[in-house]
Design a protein with these regions (language model features):
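Short beta-to-alpha linker loops that shape the active-site pocket of alpha/beta-hydrolase fold enzymes
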Residues: 71-74, 108-109, 153, 253, ...
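N-terminal carbohydrate-binding accessory modules
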Residues: 4-67, 196, 317-318
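Acidic/histidine-rich helix-loop elements
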Residues: 29, 33-55, 77-81, 118-122, ...
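Residues embedded in well-ordered beta-strands within globular domains across many folds
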Residues: 37-39, 69, 151, 192, ...
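Feature marks short, surface-exposed loop/turn motifs that line or immediately flank catalytic pockets
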Residues: 42-44, 74-78, 111-113, 156, ...
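Aromatic-lined substrate-binding rim segments of carbohydrate-active enzymes
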Residues: 52-114, 129, 171-186, 265-285
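Extracellular glycoside hydrolase catalytic/binding regions
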Residues: 17, 49, 121, 128-149, ...
Length: 321
């Protein structure tokens, strides 16, 4: 039976653990779960805005979500320090549970972890810091099934060589190292692995998948990554992976060319949403829309009364169908 996750309720004391079964996510009853949700902005920003609270998560739930993604920028992690930031995450995990949603913890860096060259200052990290982050997350949340997913690295890219070189084999080994560290601490959160081209391209998985069981793959197929018609290109670039492994699109979204914050690769219209929803329905792929915020783009709403933006209107309706 294919269902959207409805397994968390504030009235329930037990949250069902999510696991990988073949190419599906399943709950403890063996039911297939297709996840749908939104990425928050960085908890650090939401604290600054005074919005890191239950009302924010309840609003997200009302917009049709059963999953929320926390993008944790390395610079924000260092700014607060491990203990203070973990306290923020504890709050967010509790808010998500109360609202009936699962959580993705996302190490939100962009660049080349091998060379330790990154696209901007707030994405700066090191292999050591990244490994230590996942060790801390594994220890903290190994017994908390609300934290269903660990997105190991947001958007890997060598930026056409500007950030150095990294082969798939080298990137695969780094991910396998993180998975080893996480699982050695008894943590059952599902590792999410991205490919190059800013987490778009999963073609190397066909011949050289991650050497670990219970893993899922991610793509960020924004509209301008490929020209219309998208569907066959999506299948060739990342969709084929869903024949063997679970896939979750941890960033999708769009805005008009004249909308606030419009930038490549997100400029499009509702036809992108229609194509993506049809594709996910056909394949069972899960998805997360970027971003549940009024400032970061493409934004979901235009004010803190949660007045939907153009894409906000679209995803709110789509996820509540």
């Amino acid at each position: 039976m294919d269902i959207y996750a409805q397994t968390i309720s504030s009235s329930e004391s037990k949250v069902q653990r999510i696991a990988v079964s073949g190419n599906k996510f399943v709950n403890e009853a063996g039911q297939t779960i297709q996840f749908k949700g939104y990425s928050s902005s960085d908890p650090d920003k939401l604290v600054y805005n005074g919005k890191w609270n239950q009302a924010y998560f309840d609003e997200m739930k009302a917009w049709g979500a059963n999953l929320v993604r926390f993008p944790i920028h390395p610079a924000a992690w260092r700014k607060h320090g491990k203990n203070a930031y973990q306290s923020l995450l504890d709050q967010g995990v509790a808010y998500a549970k109360n609202a009936g949603m699962y959580v993705i913890i996302d190490w939100h860096s962009i660049g080349n972890l091998k060379s330790e060259l990154f696209q901007a200052e707030n994405y700066e990290t090191t292999k050591k810091e990244t490994f230590e982050f996942w060790r801390a997350m594994a220890i903290r949340y190994k017994d908390n099934p609300t934290v269903a997913f660990f997105e190991l690295y947001n958007e890997p890219t060598v930026y056409n060589g500007q950030l150095g070189t990294c082969t798939w084999a080298e990137w695969k080994a780094l991910n396998e190292e993180m998975i080893t560290i996480i699982r050695a601490h008894g943590c059952k959160a599902i590792p999410l692995v991205a490919g190059f081209n800013w987490a778009y391209d999963l073609t190397p998985v066909k011949d050289n998948p991650i050497n670990a069981t219970g893993v899922a793959y991610v793509s960020h197929p924004y509209p301008q990554k490929r020209e219309k018609p998208w569907e066959d290109k999506w299948t060739a670039d990342w969709g084929f992976v869903a024949d063997k492994y679970p896939v979750i699109l941890t960033e999708i979204g769009f805005c008009g060319a004249d909308d606030i914050g419009a930038h490549i690769p997100v400029i499009s219209d509702e036809s992108y949403g229609d194509a993506m929803m049809a594709y996910c329905k056909k394949t069972g792929i899960s998805y997360v829309a970027w971003v549940f915020d009024m400032n970061w783009a493409p934004r979901m709403f235009s004010d803190w009364n949660y007045t939907p933006s153009r894409q906000g209107k679209y995803w709110k309706a789509a996820m509540n169908r």
